[in-house]
Amino acid sequence: MEVVEAAAAQLETLKFNGTDFGVGEGPAAPSPGSAPVPGTQPPLQSFEGSPDAGQTVEVKPAGEQPLQPVLNAVAAGTPAPQPQPPAESPACGDCVTSPGAAEPARAPDSLETSDSDSDSDSETDSDSSSSSSSSSSSSSSSSSSCISLPPVLSDGDDDLQIEKENKNFPLKTKDELLLNELPSVEELTIILPEDIELKPLGMVSSIIEQLVIIESMTNLPPVNEETVIFKSDRQAAGKIFEIFGPVAHPFYVLRFNSSDHIESKGIKIKETMYFAPSMKDFTQYIFTEKLKQDKGSDASWKNDQEPPPEALDFSDDEKEKEAKQRKKSQIQGRKKLKSEFNEPGEDFTEVHQNWNAHSSASEHAKGYRNREFTRGFSRARYPRSCHGRPPPQHFYNSEHMVSQETSGFPSQRQNNPIMPQYPFPLPVFDMHNFPLRPPPPPPPPPVNMGWATPNMAAHPLLNLPYSLPPPPPPPPLPPPPSSGDSNSHFGPYY
C-alpha cells in the first residue's frame, strides 16, 4: 500500500510540475551501475508478485497518466513516461474505462524498456483484462438472455390464429340467433305401428356438427317444417328444422343438440329417411300454388332481415306491366274523346253531300230528315221540311232568329269551334223541267258562326263582332206556264 501511495504522489508531481519521475519528493531513481536499494525493492516485488491477491487499483480518469506504466518504470529503474498532452487525450474526460480499455493507453517506450518483470506484469494485466472482458461478456449475454423477444408468426400461423378467433366469435346480425343460443331440441320417442305406411323422403347427404342434411327424392310433394322424420326401424329421428333449395328438389335440415346426440340416434351418411304421408299430425305439406300468390323480395332490409310488406320492392316486370296498363287506359280515353269529337263532323259531311244532291225531291227529303246540324244547325231550332212546301217567311226573319238563337241554346253557341266557310251558290231551276215547285234553298247559317268574310258587316240588331247578314228572301213564284204567252220571263224551251 505504501508503494501505491508513493506512485500516486509521483503522478500528481508529474501532472502539475511536468518533470521526470526522478525529480521531486519521491526517491531518486538508481543509476544503472548502482545496486538496487534493499529497502524499496522487496515491496515492489511483493506488489508485482501478487496481482491476483484481490487488491484492486483505482482507475484514473481519462487524461491522467495510467498507473501501470508508472509502476513498471519504478520497477525497472527508468524514468517515468511524460504525460500525454491534453489535445491527445480522449474526448470523454469523465467516462470510466475498464481495465481492458486502459491497455491501449500504454506508451510504447515503456513496453520496449521494460524487463522481464514488466513483461510478467503485463501478462498478468492481460490475463486480468481478459478475465474481466469474459466476465463482462458473460454478464452481457446473461442480460441479453433475460430479455425475451416476441415470436415471429408466419402467414400460415396468422391465418390459423384468425380462423380460431373467428370460430370463437362468429359473425352475426343484430337479431340473429346462433345454433348454441337456440333452445334445446326435444327428444322424440315416437314409434309408428306396422299398419301405417312409410314413404322414403330422401337420403342423408351430410352431417355438419349438430345438423343433419337430407336430400329429397324427386317426384315427391315437398313437406313443411315441423314434419316428423322416421328411420327405417319406424322410430322418430327428428323434426325438420329448415328447408332450402329448389321447390322440385328441396333439402331438409334436422337439428340436434350435439354431435353425440346424432350418434345416439344412429344416423349415418347415405341412410334413407322416411315420412308418414297419411299421418296429418306428423306430416305437413307445402302448397306451391299458395306460394306463387305471395309476393317475395330478395332485398335485405335493416340488420340484414327480411323487409316488411309495406317496404317490399317488386320486380321490374310488374312495374313495366303497370306502366303498360296506364298507357293503354290513356290511349283508350283519347280514342273515346276523339270519337265524340268527330261525330258532328261526320254529320256535317253528310249534310254537304246531301246539299250537292238536292236536285231531286226525294234526295232533298232524305237529306233533311233526321239530320242534326251541330256545327251551326240544330234539330230543335229548325223543324223538318215537308215535300213541296217552302219554309214560312217568319223563319227568315232576322229578329225571330236572334230571339230564337239567344233563348234556345246559348251554351252551344259559345262552345262551337270555328269552322271553315263553304260558299255554295244558289241553284237555278228551269220551271219548264219541273212540274212542281223547286225545293227551297238551304237554311242560312246562324249568326254565331265564328268565321269572317271580306265583305262581312255587323248585323244591325246584334252587338256581335262577327255576324252574317240576313239571307235574301226567296224569289217570287212565277205564274204557271202557258203556250200562248210569248212574253214569259223564261221563254219557250226547244
UniProtKB/Swiss-Prot annotation:
InterPro entries: Gar1/Naf1_Cbf5-bd_sf, H/ACA_rnp_Gar1/Naf1, Naf1, Transl_B-barrel_sf. Keywords: Acetylation, Cytoplasm, Isopeptide bond, Nucleus, Phosphoprotein, Ribonucleoprotein, Ribosome biogenesis, RNA-binding, rRNA processing, Ubl conjugation. Residues 18-159, 296-347, 462-494 are annotated as: Disordered. Residues 127-145 have a biased composition (Low complexity). Disulfide bonds: none annotated. GO terms for biological process: box H/ACA snoRNP assembly; positive regulation of telomere maintenance via telomerase; positive regulation of telomere maintenance via telomere lengthening; ribosome biogenesis; RNA stabilization; snoRNA guided rRNA pseudouridine synthesis; telomerase holoenzyme complex assembly; telomerase RNA localization to Cajal body. Pfam families: Gar1. Residues 112-126 have a biased composition (Acidic residues). It is linked to Pulmonary fibrosis, and/or bone marrow failure syndrome, telomere-related, 7: An autosomal dominant disease associated with shortened telomeres. Pulmonary fibrosis is the most common manifestation. Other features include aplastic anemia due to bone marrow failure, hepatic fibrosis, and increased cancer risk. Phenotype, age at onset, and severity are determined by telomere length. RNA-binding protein required for the maturation of box H/ACA snoRNPs complex and ribosome biogenesis. During assembly of the H/ACA snoRNPs complex, it associates with the complex and disappears during maturation of the complex and is replaced by NOLA1/GAR1 to yield mature H/ACA snoRNPs complex. Probably competes with NOLA1/GAR1 for binding with DKC1/NOLA4. This is H/ACA ribonucleoprotein complex non-core subunit NAF1.
